[in-house]
């Protein structure tokens, strides 16, 4: 049985329109351990590269899912000995690095699962808005209200028996995150 994170990724992947190029960066085997002994292994900048050829937009996407009401993140000002959180320092910094390029949209995709009632809510947030939230909140976690307050955009989804289908065609065609260049 797949873990919920891989199942969310699989549902997200199945929701991508056929005319988009989607590439999953391969995780190293050490990426699945929680040990600090693997600090010298390759760390992917994000989970996916997605290209919308019709609009000429390249997305760098990091997907996160949780059953909790919040998502934790590591502080970028601290060294790598800090306790591990759901969003890692290198993921934040990598997405920030990609944001300097024209037509490149580095984003987080956040999925909140209410497992007791079988409902999921998913949002996409541009890294620039994430950084405003990061600096604006006086805590090392955020919830859905925080996300919405910092311009995260909800992705419409439908549950099909067990798995979700996310309407990414409509989402990508109607959102540009008002990226400042």
Question: What positions do the PLM features span?
Answer:
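Short connector loops at helix/strand junctions that flank enzyme active sites
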Residues: 41-45, 56-60, 90, 101-103
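Short beta-strand-loop-alpha-helix junction that forms the active-site gateway
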Residues: 63-85
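A structural signal for short, well-ordered beta-strand segments and their strand-loop junctions
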Residues: 24, 60, 107-110
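Acidic-basic catalytic patches of nuclease active cores, encompassing PD-(D/E)XK
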Residues: 1-42, 53-54
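Short, solvent-exposed loop/turn segments at secondary-structure junctions
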Residues: 30-32, 68-72, 114-117
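Helix-rich interaction surfaces within compact, conserved domain-sized segments
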Residues: 4-22, 125-181
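Nucleic-acid nuclease catalytic cores
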Residues: 93-131
């Amino acid at each position: 049985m797949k873990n919920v994170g891989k199942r969310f990724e699989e549902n997200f992947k199945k929701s991508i329109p056929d005319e988009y190029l989607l590439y999953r960066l391969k995780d190293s085997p050490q990426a699945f351990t929680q040990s600090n002994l693997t600090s010298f292994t390759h760390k992917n900048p994000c989970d996916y590269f997605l290209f919308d050829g019709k609009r000429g937009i390249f997305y760098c996407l990091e997907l996160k899912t949780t059953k909790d009401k919040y998502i934790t993140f590591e502080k970028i000002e601290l060294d790598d000995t800090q306790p591990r959180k759901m969003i890692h320092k290198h993921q934040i910094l990598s997405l920030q690095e990609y944001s300097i390029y024209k037509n490149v949209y580095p984003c987080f995709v956040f999925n909140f699962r209410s497992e007791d009632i079988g409902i999921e809510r998913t949002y996409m947030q541009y890294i620039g808005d994430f950084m405003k939230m990061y600096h604006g909140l006086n805590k090392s976690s955020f919830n859905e209200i925080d996300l919405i307050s910092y311009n995260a955009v909800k992705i419409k989804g439908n549950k099909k028996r067990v798995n979700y289908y996310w309407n990414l065609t409509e989402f990508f065609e109607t959102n540009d995150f008002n990226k400042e260049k």
